[in-house]
């Protein structure tokens, strides 16, 4: 109901305005017969105003507004939607002309009128008659005694509602009309946002938003709908295992109407109707969602846990990564975290994981993490082809099965070097957004494939500020509530990567009241040992216990056991290897230690070649102040560890690649720690040239 536009809600229309004959247009009282005036007019006359025109000097002639019949208000016909005035809620046209009513999907028995004629669809036939659907929730029966001809499932029929029985059953009879008007009967429900639905349990509501996930179950079809305040799951049932609303896929803008219920403590809408929107209305909803996402995605303002010029210089880049991750969460875009399979990479990834999982559950429900999040380790110190192929296959499968967006790829402790290029070129083809948080020496060529790239080398820092340190602070930007549970992770990362940066000492001191340095060292070793056996699995439960996210006694027990096993394996390996280490003094005074890991080390067990070379290097550095380089090699690889030598391993790899034709040299890593690969037949040439290059470097 609203004001009549024809009369501006007055109920009358002015048709003429003329001069008052009593006062000649002056508005002043003249000589008049007081006995002929009413009390009000008498008061006006005594006050000097003309009682005929009320002092205006003119007489206004009006007539009743025909549009609203003098009511000043108009109604909307419940059947045809046209404006009318008067009593009731149906216009005169609809009451006089024969009409057949077509109920919308939202209509129920409360919208029925006994004696009215409706259009329906035959849903099923039985011996005693035919069932007819008048809407999604309204069904009646035509008894066989009232059927003069055969009807089949799917036939459109016109039926008169003869009676609504006490048990709610509808008694229908078929009718035939030569002239009639189809009148669509719509029903609207109040629109809410997803964040308001908890108070609407048991009610029928409408929401508008964007479909971000479609999942077909053995029963209903589950649509996940995103609006400006969050997401809600909507269950639509056609038949068991049959896709409901097949015309609606992910990214569609829709309105959904249905009953609000709780399922496993999560809000769910039991869909009564779902309509796809296009044009201006869809654009408005889309823009509203985007604006809300942009505001919600802003990361939290935090103070870093330790003082660091490098971290301070990286803050803007870290905020950009945090915002991109938060946006993925709140828009229900899947997130894939890739990390190097060592203590630094694992703590970096787990810090982010602990920050985002509560938000993912909050946005998408208790099982959302299984649809919108995955973490995978990378064995190589770069994002290699086996990683990207697996990630793309998983992403495309999820897109085909559930209509999901392609994921946001978050790479930590990897992703900065030329070796990552082949994989990044594939992400570009598929339109997968990539952000990198790393501390390996970066190659600028990768940045063209990345949305964001945070690396201490970009601001004058170096590998001493590890990925675990950066991601610990990044996680707090994403979700500050996880600070207390993850603040020991940067210290574990520092010890695992043997960082000597001042930030390492600061993070270790930060948690000294809870963890001894030896405790943190043990956690780092346990992570390295577990990572070796986990291979491509994320091992979330085991890793959480190692990092003390579960029961304290279990944490202590598993760390102690894994460290005993790891140290035993390392000692066995060194007992075998140390007698076979060959040492020579290079021209620059460097002590070069070389071991053939192919022939003089246990293979396919812990510690792997890189860890073995590192342990040998540490032992050889004890009690030795000279510059030391340890080179562990196999048929087609070499692992380099160094101390006191100004090395740049990525640059050395490029030089070897250019100088030794046919050697197929590639590799990289940090400036002073890395690995090189080459073809087996050129091993002697590569190692000889490598030794020459090391002997010509500056030492300190």
Annotate each language-model stretch with its function.
Residues 167-189, 261-288:
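OB-fold/S1-family single-stranded nucleic acid-binding modules
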Residues 112-126, 157-161, 201-218, 258:
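Structural detector for short beta-strands of small beta-barrel domains
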Residues 330-337, 341-342, 444-599, 616-617, ...:
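A structured phosphate/pyrophosphate-recognition subdomain
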Residues 235-237, 344, 358-435, 442-445:
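N-terminal small/polar loop signature for handling phosphorylated ligands or for N-terminal nucleophile
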Residues 147-158, 240-257:
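Short nucleic-acid-contacting surface segments enriched for D/E, G, S/T with interspersed K/R
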């Amino acid at each position: 109901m609203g004001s009549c536009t024809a009369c501006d809600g007055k109920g009358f229309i002015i048709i003429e305005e003329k001069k008052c004959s009593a006062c000649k247009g002056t508005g002043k009282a003249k000589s008049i017969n007081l006995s002929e005036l009413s009390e009000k007019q008498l008061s006006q006359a005594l006050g000097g105003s003309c009682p005929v025109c009320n002092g205006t000097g003119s007489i206004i002639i009006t007539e009743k507004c025909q549009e609203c019949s003098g009511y000043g208000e108009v109604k909307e016909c419940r059947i045809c939607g046209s404006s009318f005035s008067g009593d009731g809620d149906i216009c005169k046209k609809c009451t006089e002309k024969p009409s057949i009513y077509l109920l919308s999907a939202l209509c129920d028995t409360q919208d029925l009128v006994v004696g009215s004629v409706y259009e329906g669809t035959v849903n099923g036939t039985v011996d005693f008659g035919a069932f007819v659907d008048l809407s999604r929730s309204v069904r009646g029966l035509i008894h066989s005694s009232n059927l003069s001809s055969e009807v089949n499932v799917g036939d459109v029929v016109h039926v008169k509602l003869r009676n609504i029985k006490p048990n709610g059953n509808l008694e229908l009879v078929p009718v035939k009309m030569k002239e009639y008007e189809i009148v669509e009967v719509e029903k609207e429900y109040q629109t809410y946002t997803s964040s308001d639905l908890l108070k609407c349990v048991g009610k029928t509501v409408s929401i508008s938003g964007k479909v971000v996930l479609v999942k077909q179950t053995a029963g209903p079809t589950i649509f996940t709908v995103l609006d400006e305040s969050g997401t809600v799951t909507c269950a639509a049932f056609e038949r068991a295992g049959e896709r409901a609303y097949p015309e609606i896929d992910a990214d569609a803008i829709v309105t959904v109407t249905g009953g609000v219920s709780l399922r496993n403590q999560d809000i769910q809408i039991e869909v009564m109707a779902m309509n796809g929107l296009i044009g201006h209305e869809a654009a408005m909803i889309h823009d509203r969602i985007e604006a809300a996402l942009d505001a919600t995605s802003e990361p939290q303002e935090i103070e870093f846990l330790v003082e660091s010029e490098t971290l301070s210089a990286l803050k803007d880049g870290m905020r950009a990564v945090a915002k991109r991750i938060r946006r993925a969460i709140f828009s229900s875009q899947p997130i894939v975290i890739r990390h190097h399979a060592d203590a630094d990479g694992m703590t970096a990834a787990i810090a982010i994981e602990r920050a985002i999982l509560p938000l993912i559950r909050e946005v998408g429900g208790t099982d959302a993490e299984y649809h919108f999040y995955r973490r995978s380790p990378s064995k190589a110190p770069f994002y290699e082809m086996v990683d990207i192929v697996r990630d793309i296959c998983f992403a495309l499968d999820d897109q085909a099965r559930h209509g999901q967006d392609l994921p946001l790829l978050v790479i930590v402790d990897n992703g900065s070097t030329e070796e990552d290029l082949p994989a990044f070129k594939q992400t570009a083809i598929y339109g997968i957004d990539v952000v990198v948080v790393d501390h390996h020496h970066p190659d600028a060529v990768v940045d063209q494939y990345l949305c964001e790239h945070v690396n201490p080398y970009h601001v004058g820092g170096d590998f001493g500020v590890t990925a675990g340190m950066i991601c610990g602070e990044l996680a707090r930007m994403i979700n500050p509530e996880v600070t207390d549970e993850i603040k020991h992770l940067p210290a574990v990362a520092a010890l695992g990567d043997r960082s000597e940066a001042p930030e390492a000492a600061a993070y270790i001191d930060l948690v000294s009241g809870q963890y001894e340095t030896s405790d943190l060292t043990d956690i780092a070793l346990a992570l390295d040992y577990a990572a070796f056996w986990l291979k491509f699995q994320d091992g979330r439960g085991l890793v959480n216990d190692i990092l003390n996210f579960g029961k304290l006694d279990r944490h202590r027990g598993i760390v102690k056991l894994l460290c005993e096993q790891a140290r035993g394996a390392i000692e066995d390996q060194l007992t075998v290897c140390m007698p076979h280490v060959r040492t020579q003094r290079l021209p620059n005074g460097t002590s070069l230690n070389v071991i053939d890991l192919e022939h003089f080390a246990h293979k396919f067990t812990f510690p792997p070649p890189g860890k073995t070379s590192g342990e040998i290097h540490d032992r050889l550095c004890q009690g030795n102040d000279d510059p030391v380089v340890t080179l562990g090699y196999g048929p087609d690889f070499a692992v380099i560890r160094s101390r006191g030598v100004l090395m740049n391993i990525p640059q050395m790899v490029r030089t070897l690649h250019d100088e030794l034709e046919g050697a197929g040299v590639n590799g990289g890593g940090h400036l002073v720690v890395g690995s090189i690969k080459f073809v087996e037949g050129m091993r002697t040439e590569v190692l000889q040239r490598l030794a020459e290059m090391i002997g010509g470097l500056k030492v300190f």
